Amino acid sequence: MAAERLIGFDVGTTAVKAAVFDKSGAVEARFVEDYPTQRRGIALVEQDPEDWVRLIKKALRIFDGNKIAAIGLCSQVNTHIFVDADGNALCPAIVWKDRRASDEAASLDAQVTSKQKEAWWGVPMPIDSSHAIARMAWVAKNQPDIWSKTRWVMLPKDYCMLKLTGKASTDPLSNIGLVDSNLNYIPEVLALVPGAAQRMAPLIAITEIAGSIKQGAMKGTPIVSGTMDAWAGLVGTGGAKDQSTIYLSGTSEILGISSQKVVPTAGAIVFPKTHGIQVHAAPTQNGGDAKLWFSQVSGITMNDMSDMVKETKRGSATPLFLPQLEGERAPHWNPNLRGAFLGVSRQTGLPDLARAVYEGVAFSACQALNTIKKSADVNSDIISCGGGGFRSVTWTQIRANILNTNIRTLISGEPGVLGAVILAAIGTGIHSDFETAHTALAKYSDDYYPDAKEADVYSSIFEIYKDAINANADLSKRLIELNEFEEIQ
């Protein structure tokens, strides 16, 4: 049993999370440590890649007393590091929330028809400001010295893998938008930016051993390639089973459905099928980050915010919150959307605003979920949920009411960490397939059931939410243009 312990790492948006699991799913040790994000302007969001590597090595030293069979790794994606031939980052990592490449994205997207997108990706997925090809276009244009020195354009887990093993590789799923249904790079996409194809790392399977730790703590321990945190988290929460619905809540909200059927739907993402699993996904731009923002501007702790919402009922003083603080991904894919409180009255107090934040995030998740229900042609009667946003009983119940669906929550660790462990278990033969591994390793809490009366009220408010998002789109764009002009002056 000792030789069958596994470590899962999740290099997330705000922290490195890790855990040691035994074969039965018992968590023997955990590690979580935050790192900073820099915002040097209204569109720039950056991180230091060395923070990720430093914290992974720190966790490995802490876990070093265990006998580890293998390590699995997942990470945030659409965060890009431009790396030289010696394996060193040439500049800060451009985080997925960064919008500097919005103009390049719009220009590239205009060059591709919806028919081409469906042929490449199965759905008319847009090229947005977080797309790798848009980022490469921006760097090539604005930082030609960095572009000329770039050997690899890497994702966080792949950069960490390079530093730990000395080998450059990546996986197909993490490169959504660059690969086709056969899990190969799409030459026509890479050709949109001259030199892009030569800067992509070799593709290997998500369960393939990418290399072994070359020095330091746990030297010689194999590391499985792994994949993006969203896909790992969706599988870790139960997405390996066909027609299952998954909801991950972290910095942002990610909705997913496993389905072999594809109905091309604007706003949805369909990951290439791997190991027989085909996931439809709708990642939003804001989730737990909206709660963090409100905590910071209001001066109340996030724990106090949760207690405040628990003691507050929805009523006439509760406004509607649009959580698009830094644009929106699914289903709108609009970097210019901004947040708002609507319906604030003289009776509205801080607790009402806090409740509105919880509800607004859930409304955005509801709209995202409806998009992939259509894409996957699936309507589940239960949603398996995981991530930090589901630690709040009150917020979980609000979500159940707004989604009007039963919810069960994962209690066996962070979804991404568990997903990475599942990949390591399959890669080393400890478990034979995803469903077997998930059954052995995952544990759930009791279900949350929607309150029929609350669900009915929220259904009416959701219709207003959708109209408000549409009405706010032009206003947001006009405000951004004005603010950018004023900042330049």
What spans do the regions from the language model cover?
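N-terminal glycine/serine-rich phosphate-binding loop of ATP-dependent small-molecule kinases
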Residues: 1-91, 149, 217-225, 403-407, ...
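Active-site phosphate-binding/coordination module
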Residues: 56, 61-133
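ATP-dependent carbohydrate kinase catalytic cores
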Residues: 177-275, 286, 390-394, 399
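Glycine-rich phosphate-binding/hydrolytic loop that grips phosphoryl groups
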Residues: 106, 229-236, 282-285, 291-295, ...
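A short helix-loop
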Residues: 119-122, 140-143, 162-167, 187-192, ...
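Acidic, glycine/GT-rich loop-and beta-edge segments that sit at the periphery of enzyme/chaperone cores
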Residues: 297, 429-489
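Gly/Ser/Thr-rich active-site cleft segment
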Residues: 11-13, 118-228, 326, 354
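Activation-segment/catalytic-loop signature of the eukaryotic protein kinase fold
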Residues: 315-409
